[in-house]
């Protein structure tokens, strides 16, 4: 020990700093569980969430430095890598598996689904590792998300302060969510009190989580907000002015035909018009994003060729290539078993074909998305998932609707999980590159956490569906609904084709503007209940005002940690109440 001028004891370290330690892994697991539950819950509400790495880095400082008094930045980097690997399932699973619940196909084998997602995650990591040196060391792709996390890690004092602010957000959001659940006050009908017409839908969703997500997204969320306002504050008044909205009597008849009770005008507009158009916009925007990413796809292929020529995979900085081969072969075998046994109707040949195609798609998509997110900080994951499941459902179409849906989503979820893990690892490796971490140890940490996310998310989906219902007003699950609508359209052909096509055209047009994901963002505004959009607006305005009045530094150092706490607090309380509802329901019945 040494004594500073202030009289404080300071540890003098000799030898290497701790990095891949049991403490870093266990802390990463705990933080990963917290973040994954929160982000998974947020994803079911908004259709998107936030990268878990920055939250994990902030929380990691609070635990490792603030509580455990450990001072290694690279140990926190490993903890953050492990936590974000667990959180990879929040997008990987939430973008795909909810479609089964929305379609009513809940009798699938959850254990097979978990093993399939784990196999997909392993493949995604193993395929992308050989490209690390090419993409990060040589091409120097920016990976803005990874740079942001490195900035947090390089400011250890600020990291502890941010952790305290985050806990304040957790307590505030958790308290509001608890009161909201106990009192059942989940929406505030402000529009009725100020005389707003019913069709303008002046109802606010009571959710600090939504405000937190919006604050973190900042100006990037404006397009999402614009989509919602275009529906209810522009198009709806125009329809009313032209006398194209149904009368109360007609609305009652429509409600009986749709099987809806208490069908309000805003709900009618959403079900009949805005939601189908929004689904079309999501599909059109996602697929156009793939087309626009073709130059990046070419760069990805060149990166693979360069890596092969220079023997990048054999670098001592990476995991041994033989271990990667073993992992790939083992994961492909598991994926094949999952595909063959996913449903009774599945034959061996068809199942093997699905597994092989899924593996090829994982390899291609993981590289493509890693290139996209490295250059633009945006990846067309939803579009890649839609394409994968479309190919799979065409292969399984002759098995019958139920079998085709379940088997396609099982393999499709594995591909989605792989894409999520590949992009997450590259972001973390960029962070490690900037703080001096050893890539091999980060890669081991990523592998060690791949199993936990799918276990957590599949279980969470069953809990939330039983308590609230996936696809409901409380948990709209936009990405899962889009996937479900697409599968239903392929198998049954009973879809509002013209509305979907109109939306797809609009989404494609918006996506060509050069603003990454614009068609998808505006489409989400069309699709989601306007109450969520209104509340989201508060967070967007707060971020813009904070940047302008207090400065961007204040927003990043104070605002974002509090906003992250708002996400975690409500997410944990929401899941806690879901478990409570199920237990009390069982006891009561």
Regions found by a protein language model. Name each.
Residues 1-589:
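Alpha-helical multipass membrane-protein architecture
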């Amino acid at each position: 020990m040494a004594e500073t001028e202030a009289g404080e004891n300071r540890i003098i370290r000799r030898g290497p700093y701790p990095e891949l330690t049991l403490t870093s892994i266990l802390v990463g697991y705990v933080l990963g569980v917290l973040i994954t539950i929160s982000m998974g819950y947020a994803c079911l509400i908004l259709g998107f969430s936030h990268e878990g790495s920055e939250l994990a880095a902030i929380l990691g400082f609070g635990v490792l430095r603030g509580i455990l008094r450990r001072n290694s930045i690279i140990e926190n980097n490993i903890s953050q890598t492990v936590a974000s690997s667990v959180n990879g399932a929040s997008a990987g699973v939430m973008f795909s598996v909810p479609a089964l619940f929305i379609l009513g196909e809940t009798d699938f084998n959850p254990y097979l689904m978990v093993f399939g997602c784990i196999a997909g995650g392993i493949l995604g990591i193993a395929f992308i590792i050989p490209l690390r040196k090419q993409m990060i060391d040589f091409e120097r792709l920016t990976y803005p998300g990874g740079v942001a996390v490195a900035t947090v890690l390089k400011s250890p004092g600020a990291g502890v302060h941010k952790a305290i602010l985050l806990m304040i957000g957790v307590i505030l959001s958790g308290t509001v969510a608890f009161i909201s659940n106990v009192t059942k006050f989940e929406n505030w009908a402000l529009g009725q009190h100020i005389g707003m017409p019913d069709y303008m839908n002046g109802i606010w969703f009571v959710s600090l989580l939504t405000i937190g997500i919006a604050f973190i997204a900042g100006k990037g969320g404006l397009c999402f907000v614009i989509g919602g306002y275009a529906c209810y504050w522009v198009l709806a008044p125009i329809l009313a002015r032209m006398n194209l909205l149904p009368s109360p009597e007609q609305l009652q008849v429509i409600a009986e035909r749709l099987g809806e009770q208490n069908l309000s005008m805003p709900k009618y507009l959403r079900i009949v018009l805005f939601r189908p158009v929004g689904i079309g916009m999501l599909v059109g925007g996602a697929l156009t994003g793939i087309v626009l990413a073709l130059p990046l796809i070419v760069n990805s292929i060149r990166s693979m060729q360069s890596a092969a020529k220079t023997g990048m995979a054999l670098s001592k900085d990476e995991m041994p290539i033989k271990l990667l081969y073993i992992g790939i072969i083992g994961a492909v075998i598991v994926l094949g078993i999952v595909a063959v046994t996913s449903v009774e109707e599945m034959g061996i040949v068809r199942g093997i074909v699905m597994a092989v195609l899924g593996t090829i798609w994982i390899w291609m998509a993981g590289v493509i998305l890693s290139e996209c997110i490295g250059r633009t900080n945006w990846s067309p994951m939803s579009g890649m998932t839609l394409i994968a499941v479309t190919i799979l459902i065409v292969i399984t179409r002759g098995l019958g609707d139920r079998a085709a849906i379940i088997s396609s989503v099982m393999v499709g979820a594995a591909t989605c999980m792989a894409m999520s893990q590949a992009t997450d690892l590259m972001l973390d490796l960029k962070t490690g590159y900037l703080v001096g971490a050893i890539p091999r140890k980060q890669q081991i940490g990523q592998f060690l956490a791949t199993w936990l996310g799918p276990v957590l998310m599949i279980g969470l989906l069953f809990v939330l569906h039983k308590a609230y219902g996936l696809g409901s007003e409380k948990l709209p699950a936009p990405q899962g609904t889009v996937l479900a609508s697409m599968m239903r359209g392929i198998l049954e052909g009973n879809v509002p084709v013209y509305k979907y096509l109109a939306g797809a055209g609009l989404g494609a047009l918006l996506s060509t503007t050069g603003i990454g994901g614009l068609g998808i963002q505006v489409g989400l505004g069309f699709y989601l209940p306007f109450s969520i959009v209104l509340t989201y607006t508060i967070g967007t305005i707060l971020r813009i005002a904070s940047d302008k009045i207090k400065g961007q530094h204040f927003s990043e150092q104070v605002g974002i940690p509090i906003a992250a706490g708002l996400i975690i607090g409500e997410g944990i309380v929401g899941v806690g109440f879901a478990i409570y509802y199920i237990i009390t329901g069982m006891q009561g019945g």
